[in-house]
Amino acid sequence: MSENQQALNHVVSMEDLTVDQVMKLIKRGIEFKNGAQLPYEDHPIVSNLFFEDSTRTHKSFEVAEIKLGLERLDFDVKTSSVNKGETLYDTILTLSALGVDVCVIRHPEVDYYRELIASPTITTSIINGGDGSGQHPSQSLLDLMTIYEEFGHFEGLKVAIAGDLDHSRVAKSNMQILKRLGAELFFAGPEEWRSQEFADYGKFVTIDEIIDQVDVMMFLRVQHERHDSGAVFSKEDYHAQHGLTQERYDRLKETAILMHPAPINRDVEIADHLVEAPKSRIVQQMTNGVFVRMAILESVLASRNAN
């Protein structure tokens, strides 16, 4: 086991991870990116259960599992007993009884995992692939890995998170850990989508007030599927008021980087031609997702082997 590895029973929330655990996962992800290998001779079994649509999280977990040599047990929500009314608890109870070691789960219910990890009967480890508008720890960790590769530290970095704050599990995961790591946080976006909980972690600003000062400019997707009513803004108005235009991009510091968890609404959060601009690290984020998820899986499986 690498000295950068630290065992975890579950990975469900950034609030539950210590700074030491976070840094070890980031550094282990970088080791995997640089070619470290860890073949499993006992063939642990992982099942991915996605109750919400996903491309990057779902597929990068699959690639991570393949690279680690794990056995993957396919789970298709549409053809499972979920459609007969089976609860999430009973689904995971079944997979645990079948001997599945790890379940990667995305679910629309915030904190769905609490009941699962509290159960004395369920022995499978849980990795949260996103719970509604709650937490998204693996996305946060890949974001941190991307920032760390760029700057080599977090202390004193100015990080702005802009967009649909209230509905973003990415924003909530990142604000908690970035503050603990010593970054200075700023939040921008429509006032209708930013609750007071963000004020405990940083300062509310407009994007034009902060764009030329930040080291990291992170945009968030407008999550139409989580809004109770129709669009508050037209796409054009939102982009003009809150998105990354060419003029705003030109105001970024020479050393600043642009991030977005994706999927991207092009010409809404970010102008289409800027998604792959020189300061963009969006593709690198996707790449890093595979390696940090390898580190997460390795750490969870190490915990199981130690018990």
Curated annotation (Swiss-Prot):
Annotated GO MF terms: amino acid binding; aspartate carbamoyltransferase activity
GO biological process: 'de novo' pyrimidine nucleobase biosynthetic process; 'de novo' UMP biosynthetic process; amino acid metabolic process
This protein's name: Aspartate carbamoyltransferase catalytic subunit
Pathway: Pyrimidine metabolism; UMP biosynthesis via de novo pathway; (S)-dihydroorotate from bicarbonate: step 2/3
Keyword Transferase among UniProt keywords: yes
Organism: Streptococcus pneumoniae (strain 70585)
Keyword Transferase: yes
Pfam family, one: OTCace_N
Positions contributing to carbamoyl phosphate binding: 56-57, 106, 136, 139, 262-263
Binding site for L-aspartate: 84, 169, 221
Function text: Catalyzes the condensation of carbamoyl phosphate and aspartate to form carbamoyl aspartate and inorganic phosphate, the committed step in the de novo pyrimidine nucleotide biosynthesis pathway.
Entry-linked InterPro entries: Asp/Orn_carbamoyltranf_P-bd, Asp/Orn_carbamoylTrfase, Asp/Orn_carbamoylTrfase_sf, Asp_carbamoyltransf, Asp_carbamoyltransf_Asp/Orn-bd
Gene: pyrB
Top-tier EC class: transferase
